[in-house]
């Protein structure tokens, strides 16, 4: 259960937009944070928490049962112009003008896969299932060596096992998503 709710009116608008996409699991994606280049420490941390869209290429194996939706804003969203082969991502971010718009779209999804960003926190606060891709030296708020968090019951942490190497958490998410999507579709 979440402790935030999006505007009912905005949720209804998103339900109309997404109404044809009912056969597959709806999964939101965020692969990069905001670098905050004006704050050196934040920019350095962002390099460790963000990835390129191509890093999520293994998720293409899930496309038969999953519709992917971009929740990525900012400059990293330009990577949608050349997504990894087979990773078809629906992009409605031009319709996101506020955090409430984002919350309403997330409310219509089944799952959010994200790096440690405000979108991940928003989705978890809404009670949405969140699979968080966390850097090797993860932020203190996620505690150490845990896959769960006391802050959000619906959030699962997939942490790097080696600095700057996303292969282990992304492959774990791919396997979990294959399993989860097959269960949801059956």
Predicted feature residues:
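Catalytic machinery of carbohydrate-active enzymes
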Residues: 1-186
């Amino acid at each position: 259960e979440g402790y935030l709710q999006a505007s009912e009116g905005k949720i209804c608008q998103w339900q109309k937009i997404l109404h044809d996409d009912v056969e597959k699991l709806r999964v939101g994606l965020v692969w990069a944070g905001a670098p905050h280049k004006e704050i050196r420490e934040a920019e350095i941390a962002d390099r460790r928490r963000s990835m390129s869209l191509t890093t999520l290429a293994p998720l293409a194996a899930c496309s038969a049962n999953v519709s992917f939706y971009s929740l990525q804003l900012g400059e990293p969203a330009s990577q949608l112009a050349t997504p990894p082969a087979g990773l078809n991502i629906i992009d409605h971010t031009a319709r996101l003008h506020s955090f409430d718009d984002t919350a309403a779209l997330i409310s219509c999804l089944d799952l959010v896969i994200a790096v440690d960003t405000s979108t991940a926190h928003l989705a978890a606060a809404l009670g949405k299932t969140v699979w968080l891709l966390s850097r090797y030296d993860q932020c203190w708020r996620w505690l150490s060596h845990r896959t769960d968090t006391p802050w959000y019951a619906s959030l699962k942490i997939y942490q790097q096992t080696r600095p700057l190497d996303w292969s282990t958490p992304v492959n774990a998410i791919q396997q979990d998503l294959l399993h989860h999507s097959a269960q949801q579709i059956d």
